[in-house]
Amino acid sequence: MSGKGAPELSVRNCGDLRVAVIAAQWHEKVMDGLVDGALRALHELGIDEPTLLRVPGSFELPVVAKVLAGRGYDAIVALGVVIRGGTPHFEYVSQGVTLGLTQVTVDTGVPVGFGVLTCDTEEQALDRAGLEGSNEDKGHEAVTAAVATAATLRTVSEPWR
């Protein structure tokens, strides 16, 4: 299972961060779990007014993330699902989304939490969606990673003493 060995991140003093969550609409049940996990994580971190935007699919996540990164957000979380089918479409979309979101982070300095599931089957996606009986909660994990990185960036941006 991919969740083994995940770090336990301690994130404090982040309630004033501006965070946006962008969620694709394909695979509604999986997406509902990812969004719920993301919003729960934000609430636990004291971030009670995040921006939540929906896009048609995972391929649209990078362009919206790039625009939001230029609008003063401290962290962005991208949530989506790409499930392998019988054509090369899976590889193209997975690679495009991954590279696109990475490029947004590198170009803008705004962390983008990667909550895009790339799975062989819908069952694998459901098992990672944070639903009752799921083994993992990737929406929650993506928020924690993005906010922890934003908090680190805030620390290194402060003047050295």
UniProtKB/Swiss-Prot annotation:
Top-rank lineage group of the source organism: Bacteria
GO CC terms, sorted: cytosol; riboflavin synthase complex
Keywords from the UniProt entry: Riboflavin biosynthesis, Transferase
InterPro entries, A to Z: LS, LS/RS, LS/RS_sf
EC category: transferase
Reaction equation(s) it catalyzes: (2S)-2-hydroxy-3-oxobutyl phosphate + 5-amino-6-(D-ribitylamino)uracil = 6,7-dimethyl-8-(1-D-ribityl)lumazine + phosphate + 2 H2O + H(+)
Keyword Transferase: yes
One Pfam family hit: DMRL_synthase
Amino acids binding 5-amino-6-(D-ribitylamino)uracil: 26, 58-60, 81-83, 114
Family: Belongs to the DMRL synthase family.
NCBIfam families: lumazine-synth
Function field: Catalyzes the formation of 6,7-dimethyl-8-ribityllumazine by condensation of 5-amino-6-(D-ribitylamino)uracil with 3,4-dihydroxy-2-butanone 4-phosphate. This is the penultimate step in the biosynthesis of riboflavin.
Record protein name field: 6,7-dimethyl-8-ribityllumazine synthase
Species this chain originates from: Streptomyces griseus subsp. griseus (strain JCM 4626 / CBS 651.72 / NBRC 13350 / KCC S-0626 / ISP 5235)
Gene: ribH
